[in-house]
Amino acid sequence: MKILIIGDVHESDFWTEHVQKNKDSVEKIVFMGDYFDSFKKVSAQVAFENFKKILALRESLGNEKVIMLIGNHDFHYTKFCMGRYSGFSTTTFVLAGSSLDELVDNGTLVLSYEYDGYLFSHAGVSETWFKEMIGEDSSVEDINPLFKQSPRIVEFRNDERTTSQYGDNEHQSPIWIRPNALSENPYGDYHQIVGHTAFDFSNIDSDRVTMDNGKNLYFTDSNQHEAFILDTVTGESEILR
């Protein structure tokens, strides 16, 4: 299956061109989360309108084709989040907060998506976090139902076990963990596809590294707003520049 992957949007509409060009040649479109907090002085109204365009795309192409993951810059606008983090805008909270609450409640915004051994989430799923928060006897199919039931399982963890304020710790959730910690402690026997940590793909041809479980870790948060097409049969990922 071919999947169009749209990395962290951060209030931009860069995704529209990639979707328009590729929507008919792919089976799925996965948005990796972080729809808000651009840090580039985009007005909250423009940001919210752009987010609603993504929702309209999902309605137009179908809920099965368009997958919307949640990121940390979305979660902190919900009523479930106990903290506020970098980029937080009170105006965005007023405009979008209740909508985001509803989208979590109705399952539109999900924590993960899995297909044929490829596991998508905003930042990655660690073995440690999964066992602590989902359960040792659980499976990936349990992640989204439990998140919908108890959204605070993704809160940033700040205690004696999580010394990194950057989130580079195996106890952090799929909206917070960083690549180093994830690579050393990946959940299960899955390739993982993540956003969250930005990379410059302008001078490189590969968007992946190998994790400690021998599987690939694909990065999708591009400083230049590239998108990606993943072929789940071959494992190849095309960078759309």
Where do the PLM segments sit?
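Active-site environment of divalent metal-dependent phosphoester hydrolases
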Residues: 10-14, 37-39, 73-79, 126-128, ...
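Flexible, charged surface loops at secondary-structure boundaries
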Residues: 22-25, 62, 114, 183-189
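Internal, conserved structured core segments that host functional sites
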Residues: 73-86, 106-124
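Short aromatic-enriched loop/helix-cap "lid" or pocket-rim segments at secondary-structure transitions
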Residues: 79-83, 131-134, 206
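Conserved beta-sheet core of the metallophosphoesterase superfamily
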Residues: 175-238
